């Protein structure tokens, strides 16, 4: 082995959901929003002066930060914006998890957590969920170097009540606690109100799910000004211009259109509740989803078999080939039309064609 090969930092990378190259598919595998962004984004695109692209964007993302802060009733210095919530979370890991003690997160959770920990050489311990896939707050009361968990959790879609979230924070006031709320808009109460109560809390959200902007890559978090300043210091040490002009412009229009946002979320929640009934009738069981997806297992047909047969029909869902969840499928909530195609295919695959 060459000397330079020995010095390569090797990690097991995160594996994203498949992005089919063909167009005629039912894509229910990456928890994207099935509806387009607010029409105001299209209007912003038409107004954009292409000549301005020769100029660097605002490194402090001032206008978008202000729009987000105003929408949620926070101060500008309590908001950090990044290139998707993955970028925000990665910066959080790098900035705040520098102890010799292990950070704690669930064993069935967002798999990027362990990737970042390995990349940044952060020790970590995965905490088991209970038999029903619930996070056990007491497991996070021990000494640690930080805590991070999604709420609702992914891929289980289970929401943990805010009083339990606060219990975890209360027992960890000497470290930073990150609540990853990528799916919070589809059910449950945000931990955002705890930001002004506890100085060690960061609440991370995204435009990728409820705001139909996965292609723009906009994420953000709320925290006390000292935490936000530390994040910006680290961000500027990597790249001063992380957000491009189009992302900033479209993000502002998206966050300002509350009516359209609530309409889209309402449609997804309605379709999700119908999906619970339809999937149950087809022999599936699942935790009670508060996200824009359902984590389902069938009573007789293996998940991998269903996954493969759906793919043959150009219907894409997510299968996780890992212990404890290898007989589950994560099914994104699509439009009613997409879901009807899914149900028809599942009726055939599970032998329940009427």
Predicted regions and their residues:
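Active-site phosphate-binding strand-loop segment of PLP-dependent enzymes
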Residues: 125, 130-185
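PLP-dependent aminotransferase class I/II
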Residues: 60, 200-280, 284-287
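Conserved PLP-anchoring active-site segment centered on the Schiff-base-forming lysine
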Residues: 95-116
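PLP-dependent enzyme catalytic core of the Aspartate aminotransferase-like
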Residues: 163, 309-318, 322-354
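N-terminal "arm"/small-domain region of PLP-dependent enzymes with the aminotransferase-like
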Residues: 1-55, 143
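Phosphate-binding glycine-rich loop
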Residues: 62-102, 300
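Conserved PLP-binding catalytic core of the aspartate aminotransferase-like
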Residues: 269, 281-313
């Amino acid at each position: 082995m060459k000397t330079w090969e020995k010095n390569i930092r090797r990690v097991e990378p995160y594996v994203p959901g498949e992005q089919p190259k063909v167009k005629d598919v039912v894509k229910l595998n990456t928890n994207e929003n099935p509806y387009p962004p607010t029409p105001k984004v299209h209007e912003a695109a038409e107004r954009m002066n292409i000549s301005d692209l020769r100029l660097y964007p605002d490194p402090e993302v001032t206008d978008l930060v202000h729009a987000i802060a105003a929408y949620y009733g926070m101060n500008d210095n309590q908001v950090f914006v990044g290139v998707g919530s993955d970028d925000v979370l990665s910066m959080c890991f790098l900035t705040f998890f520098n102890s010799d003690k292990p950070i704690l997160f669930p064993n069935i959770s967002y798999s990027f957590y362990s990737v970042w920990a390995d990349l940044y050489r952060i020790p970590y311990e995965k905490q088991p969920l209970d038999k029903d896939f619930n996070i056990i707050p007491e497991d996070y009361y021990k000494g640690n170097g930080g805590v991070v968990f999604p709420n609702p959790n992914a891929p289980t879609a289970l929401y943990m009540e805010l009083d339990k979230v606060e219990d975890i924070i209360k027992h960890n006031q000497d470290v930073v606690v990150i609540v990853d709320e990528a799916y919070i808009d589809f059910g449950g109460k945000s931990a955002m109100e705890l930001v002004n109560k506890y100085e060690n809390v960061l609440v991370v959200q995204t435009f990728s799910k409820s705001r139909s902007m996965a292609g723009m890559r906009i994420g953000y978090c709320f925290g006390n000004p000292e935490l936000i300043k530390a994040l910006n210091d680290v961000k500027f040490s990597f790249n001063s211009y992380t957000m491009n002009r189009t992302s900033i412009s479209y993000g502002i229009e998206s966050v300002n259109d509350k009516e359209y946002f609530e309409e889209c979320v309402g449609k997804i929640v309605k379709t999700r509740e119908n999906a619970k009934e339809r999937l149950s009738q087809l022999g599936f069981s699942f935790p009670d989803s508060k996200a824009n997806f359902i984590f389902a297992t069938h009573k007789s047909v293996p998940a991998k078999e269903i996954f493969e047969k759906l793919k043959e029909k150009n219907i894409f869902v997510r299968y996780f080939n890992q212990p404890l969840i290898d007989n589950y499928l994560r099914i994104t909530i699509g439009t009613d039309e997409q879901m009807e195609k899914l149900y028809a295919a599942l009726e055939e695959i599970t032998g329940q064609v009427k």
